[in-house]
Amino acid sequence: MFSFSNLFSSLLVAGTILAAEAWQKQHRPSLDLSPARVAVRFEPVVIGAIAAPARVAGAWAVSAGDNRFGGISGLGIDQGKLLALSDGGMLMAIDRPGTKQPTVTIRALPAVPGPATRKIGRDSEALLRDPAGRGWWVAFEQVHSLWLYDRGFTRTLKVIPVENADFSDNHGIETLADDHGRVRWLAESTGASDAARLPDGAIMLLERRIGVGGVSSWLKWGGQRLALPLARSDNPEALTAEPLPNGGTRLWIMTDNDLKPWRRTLLVAINLPPAH
């Protein structure tokens, strides 16, 4: 039989949980923003097959001797290293797999939209090299905005507030793309988690769907769609591309472990043949 007392109790419990989560979000311990350089480990892993002519060139579970490593939300290439961005506003310059005694250099963005030592104030979701060569763009949630930093991430060059009726605190810009010299953004609601400009000028989207069975993900560009052979527990958040000597393209993809020690941060290298 329906009971108003049971309904009231359920609502009270739900309200208490939501209030506790909100309090926890606002009162998390201050983040450690000190720079560090630590060893990074690449453990080869086997993933599923990928449709030809694409080829998996390598896959690794990546870990480092710093508990701030992970939570990847953006990826680029800078000075020969992989440059990853976490959703806590931390930059990670990672030596590539195969490097002798590889390391990762971790440092904080020099300025952020909100309280610098709180996750809510530095919720960075996307990274893009400025098409004009001035530096790097970073997209933020919570305080929805685009920030342009100089090439060395030492200072802020420009801040653009972004307003959209569909945004909520934790759902806003998810992807940045270089659209023939223009900076374009995509919201999380589009399903895109990152984008990369290919050497031939095409824009490739990294898309995903999160359902009851886990995460499914794929790459989409120029009318093509390529399913990614990742585990349903892997959440791909970051994509970048670079040309190969043979005219092909190397794609680098990283997953977000949500900074949970029991989840892996996966790095996947995929080679595409030269475009015809």
Regions found by a protein language model. Give the residues of each.
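Sequence/structural signature of beta-propeller domains
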Residues: 2-276
